[in-house]
């Protein structure tokens, strides 16, 4: 998300302007729609490849200078077009889900190479009872079940990570379900979307479905120094992770987002 807003559209647009280019085009699966005189991100035709979740931080000025040629196509259509134009190797290239600068998605080795080596600490339950020892908190993610290296008689998931106390909390699958998600550093594209109806859909991670929700803004007296909102989901969402993006949609358009806290 930050790479897109700071590098691909920050530095790339600067370079485009130096070369006298009017637009930049990328291979993201997303579309741009104009509504009420403003430009919005819009879901791609290929819902399985839609990448609007990663692009929500793009500004309207960014969108005015961007073209998404693949947004109206499905992935099979793109592969067929590549094949018809002589790009047989590219048309059959395997897809990658890895972070571009981390080979084989081995972020643990990458962190170690950057000098980030956390010490072993305790696995605990929701009441703070010590269950065993983990290998370092940065090696775990919320919702993780495999690779914990501990047997407790029933499957357990990582439900909380506390870097300050170097503890990793383990719990049951349902412990990760919630109807309420809070986010900070929010950006709302047009407040009229909320005044007309606070009913939206939202995603808490890439590949998760957009779930119907209602936005609840804090009272002015409650507003913190970092803009904050709450979403109340109609159905419980699983594995909400602090630091990930919460992306808000209305009628297929990205109307805002924030960082889950």
Predicted regions and their residues:
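Cationic, low-complexity basic patches in intrinsically disordered or flexible, solvent-exposed regions
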Residues: 220-224
């Amino acid at each position: 998300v930050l790479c897109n807003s700071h590098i691909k559209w920050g530095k790339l647009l600067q370079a485009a302007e130096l070369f006298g280019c009017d637009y930049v085009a990328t291979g993201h699966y997303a579309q741009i729609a104009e509504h009420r005189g403003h430009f919005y991100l819009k879901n791609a035709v290929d819902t399985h490849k839609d990448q609007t979740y990663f692009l929500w931080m793009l500004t309207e000025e960014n969108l005015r200078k961007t073209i998404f040629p693949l947004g109206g196509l499905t992935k099979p259509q793109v592969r067929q077009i590549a094949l018809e134009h002589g790009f047989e190797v590219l048309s059959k290239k395997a897809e990658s889900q890895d972070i571009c600068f981390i080979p084989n998605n081995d972020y643990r080795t990458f962190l170690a190479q950057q000098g980030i080596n956390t010490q072993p600490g305790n696995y605990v339950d929701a009441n703070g009872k010590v269950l065993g020892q983990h290998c370092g908190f940065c090696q775990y993610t919320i919702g993780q079940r495999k690779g914990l290296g501990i047997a407790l008689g029933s499957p357990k998931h990582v439900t909380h990570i506390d870097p300050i106390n170097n503890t990793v909390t383990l719990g049951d699958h349902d412990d990760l379900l919630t109807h309420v998600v809070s986010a900070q550093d929010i950006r709302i594209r047009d407040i009229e979307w909320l005044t007309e109806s606070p009913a939206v859909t939202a995603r808490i991670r890439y590949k998760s479905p957009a779930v119907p929700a209602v936005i609840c803004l804090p009272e002015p007296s409650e507003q913190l120094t970092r803009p904050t909102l709450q979403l109340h989901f109609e159905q419980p969402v699983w594995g909400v992770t602090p630091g990930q993006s919460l992306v808000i949609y209305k009628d297929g358009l990205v109307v805002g987002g924030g960082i889950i806290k």
